[in-house]
């Protein structure tokens, strides 16, 4: 039995092998499709035979027409300090290479990204890019498709930091225009011609973007030839997009604190003139706080020569805050001057009364002698000279007393009377808010229109 069993074992294995093989084929067929036919696939080795990737299609003839299309994935960062923005885009390029045409089928062939290294590619680059890189997670983010007539679609994902010249004169009430310039690096217009794809009527993705500081209001496409004397003309395609700054965050962070500081400085107008420490400390605190706010707001901006709208508003508020402090100094000076003047009047008034009484006494004592001399002079028909001199002296002294008397008619001090300190505060309560409101109307009209 043992010998018979060993003889039958190979036969049993042969009988069972087709059954297991059919089951395996069925499992694979259920997964990949049992009716898969790839007879239409072109012979890539035959297409690439004699292919020279270092030469453009149709070299020596008409230039290659390259259609470009953009799809924006994100705009990650816009920096005013560095005048740049970071954008991630899908760049689609399409051109025809007749050397790769296969006309026996209408199927489009999707190729592995590694096949890109074997093809001729347009040398497109971003002109105003500061830095750029390709994405390679989990594989290189490149797509290439080959159509039967030799048309190649090449798509790549690029993240680039691009320069953007900004005019910050109206910051933060400004609108900026940034560009993305695409150009051939080595091929002139005699070898390659760029044009926007017919499907590029709008940039996909821009309508879904949510930027923290800006809103994209519009965009447009341009095509131009750049002239270089030493190299010729090079085609350039540009995407221009308008950015309007979102003003809400700046109103909350910069404008409203400045307005509140100015209003806080007006509180001193309702504080008594006698409360010197309170009014001085309030004025100095508002001035220093306004200075700190100005410095912190400017730290995130470039040191540009242009005066920005935010700087103008900060200086307007700074002037009003400082003027409120100066107003108290002026009012306090007037109050102190009035006190000293009243004290001086009280001292000089008794002296003036004493001088008048002394003059009356002297006049009474000399009245008898003057009368006798006057009688003698009348009999002789003349007026004594010393009497005329006395009259003139009295007249001059009277004029002096009238002109120099405090508060007298025609006096200089009567025309320059110091204003009461409380009256100055009352005027300031109305003048400062009205002037600040008028300046704000002019400011917002000038920078928002």
Curated annotation (Swiss-Prot):
Subcellular location: Cell membrane
Disulfide bond annotation, renumbered to this chain: 164-178
Catalytic activity: chloride(in) = chloride(out)
Domain of life assignment: Eukaryota
PROSITE patterns: NEUROTR_ION_CHANNEL
Keyword DNA-binding (UniProt): no
Topological domain spans for side Cytoplasmic: 272-275, 332-423
Transmembrane parts of this sequence: 252-271, 276-298, 309-331, 424-446
Record has Membrane as a keyword: yes
InterPro entries: GABAA/Glycine_rcpt (IPR006028), GABAAd_rcpt (IPR008098), Neur_chan_lig-bd (IPR006202), Neur_chan_lig-bd_sf (IPR036734), Neur_channel (IPR006201), Neuro-gated_channel_TM_sf (IPR036719), Neuro_actylchol_rec (IPR038050), Neurotrans-gated_channel_TM (IPR006029)
Signal peptide range: 1-24
Extracellular topological domain: 25-251, 299-308, 447-449
Family of this protein: Belongs to the ligand-gated ion channel (TC 1.A.9) family. Gamma-aminobutyric acid receptor (TC 1.A.9.5) subfamily. GABRD sub-subfamily.
UniProt subunit comment: Heteropentamer, formed by a combination of alpha (GABRA1-6), beta (GABRB1-3), gamma (GABRG1-3), delta (GABRD), epsilon (GABRE), rho (GABRR1-3), pi (GABRP) and theta (GABRQ) chains, each subunit exhibiting distinct physiological and pharmacological properties.
Name of this protein: Gamma-aminobutyric acid receptor subunit delta
